[in-house]
Amino acid sequence: MTRKAILASFAALMICITFIDVSMVAAADKTCDRECLKGFISDYIDALLAQNPASLPASSNVKFTEDCKKLKLGEGLWKSKISLTDYRRDIIDPEKGTAISFLVLEEKGSPVFYVFRLKIVDDKITEIESTVVRGREEGMLFNPSNLKTISREMAYVPKKEQLNSREEMIKMAVTYPEGLKVGSFVKVDSPMAPDAYRYENGQLMAGPGCTFFQGCDNMKSQRIPTLAGIRYKVLAVDEKMGVVAIRMNFGPGSLFQGNGELDVWHSFKIYDNEIHSAEAYCEKVPAGTEFGWE
């Protein structure tokens, strides 16, 4: 190969390398970080309040579900005139491009629990998964008086040395549904802190001060039902806040009375190798109901 040919080949190689570098930077720029994902949550809430789904940066084939049913974006709660309260708790997962928010809204003067998940790809909303809980009849439990502000535990930002890895957090969080599957958190050795607590629809169901059931003041050792038919999927891991979000269907036998099952959006505060708290929104659904994303 002549010197001229060698120089030409080298120049072509440098152009290719430069193109690759620019492409990689452009791809990195498309990554939606924490603030970006929080912004999408705020945009979604603003559009919902304005009843204007067209204002959302949604993909042309966005999938939207509410209460496990596939709907057209703009249906369901979007048709109601709602207002905000002070309660908003976000779970942010930049690695998955996922943002979740637990809200307490007001509809016709009554409190409503609302939770939704957004999937962001290339600065577009591609998935919206949501649940609306209007009162005790729908939720089995309903105590909005305990959801005025985010709890101190959930608001706590763990120090870097307290945080567990993403994989460790998931492994610890799934001991909750696995414990329900066998009817014991002790049997699966769920790493619950001695003062761990659990709220469901604002009702204290486990931990210090719990009187709902006998022995519920200890989350790990309390008596729980055996829910062999439980199904679950991990939705998001907030590695900065130490929170894992899991959606569950508790399956047969999960209601206090009557037919049906309990559909649950759970979140677990995890750091220092322990589960410190669990907070969830729950809704009764007909037996055999799928999540809508199978």
What are these regions (language model features)?
Residues 1-10:
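Bacterial N-terminal signal peptides that target proteins for export
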Residues 6, 20, 142-145:
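Intrinsic disorder/low-complexity segments
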Residues 15-24:
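C-terminal segment of classical bacterial N-terminal signal peptides
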Residues 25-294:
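C-terminal and inter-domain tail/linker signature
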